Amino acid sequence: FVENVRGRESYSFEYDADWLKSSANYMYLDPDLQLYAGRQYPTGAKNVFGLFADSSPDRWGRLLMTRRERILAEQEGRKPRKLLDSDFLMGVYDETRMGAIRFKLDKDGPFLSDDSETPTPPWTSLRTLEEASRQFENDESGLEQKWINQLIKPGSSLGGARPKATVLDTKGNLWIAKFPSKHDDINVGAWEKVTHDLARLCGF
């Protein structure tokens, strides 16, 4: 549940009664969500349960969505709207959403942000996406729509601050592609490969 009070969002969660009856003995969705009926609210400094935060974009995805809102506002002759946590959560393209969870407003309805007309790009488009991410970073105005259009669906769901996108291989498997950033002072990709190889040597 999401409630907007004076421009600020308040989140709560409630288990379905039938789900509790069938799953209560063995499945916790989140360490902060206890297995009982009724509304539950995030505690401490958390605004939303980690279960849902994992499905929301991090810095890179939020930057893409914020830039897109600026472009739409410019085209419509209005001030950019401040995006709230629910805007980021619901604005993620369903097919590439991280966090192993999907969202519907109605049990028998479609998944949210499930736009089949703009599917996940194939990995043959990696160079195009890399160039789009480079141009996006160098676009000081933040109003170059063509770069946003190429990056928003494959990249908006991904966490972290680095430019990245999700692509499909020839077998239909999803891959995360990380791109160089103008802020890099080392070859980040090469060092990630080193840590990957070390992990494999350690048996992970």
Q: How should each PLM-predicted stretch be described?
A:
Residues F1-F204:
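Phosphate/dinucleotide-binding and metal-coordinating scaffold of catalytic cores
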